[in-house]
């Protein structure tokens, strides 16, 4: 089992660690976070307002974080080049600070003995992989990769199924997205993106997202055919993608449902879900799928123009894919 270090113990860092323990697919051996001391790590890992209390045991012992009896080395370095991942036995590093997202910056982890780095965010220059879509393009020569964004992980599997079966001529995506840490609790300054600085709990905030364009990077045939935007809404977690697209081959909505259901039970099992239930966002909290197609919510204007709806837990679903990508990479060593 591959040994993993986590850099940045925020929402994704903590949930990747949870996903590692619940899935048993990778082993977390080290965590670096200069802003959180050990006792605070215990508290933050144990208690989670969104996903509930951790079901195992967590304690601090001999300067280490001990989860379910497993001792994890703690570092508190600001500069990633100074983290001694090798000494802790970490082979792969999850870069989840949201700060070191380029090849050059994330590459600093390699100096401390890490063999590979997985960026838990979109990257300007690192190759992006979406499980269920293009992981087969991964090869051993790649030291630094990106797991793309939570929204790309929701959209890409659905877009792949639709494109493979009916062909997507062009499409627009909207994600109705839960609040994340980059937003403000009350109105405040926000650099160039003025709207993003408005109170997160009070507003529906139009925002930009590169998630749809990024699908073109993981499915090259869709490059230039998709773009999208986001509405940030006052919910703590779980988001939903609306993909409105023009189809090459005419299809009845029932045909679309059928192929998505087949994919969800076959090649994309565990990644793409399918439901005909009358669900709402809450129902997907702590769901580990990348994307769950809502058969009852979509609509068709005609056989070539459809609106498709898919839900995702933008925290936990994504964190599980980070773990899956690492397990997949380890299988290719």
From Swiss-Prot:
The modification Cysteine persulfide is found at residue 150. The modification N6,N6-dimethyllysine is found at residues 3, 64, 192, 213, 225, 258, 261, 332. This is Glyceraldehyde-3-phosphate dehydrogenase. The modification N6-acetyllysine is found at residues 59, 192, 217, 225, 252. The modification Deamidated asparagine is found at residues 7, 62, 68, 147, 153, 223, 314. One of its GO terms (biological process) is innate immune response. It comes from Cricetulus griseus. The record marks 177 as: Activates thiol group during catalysis.
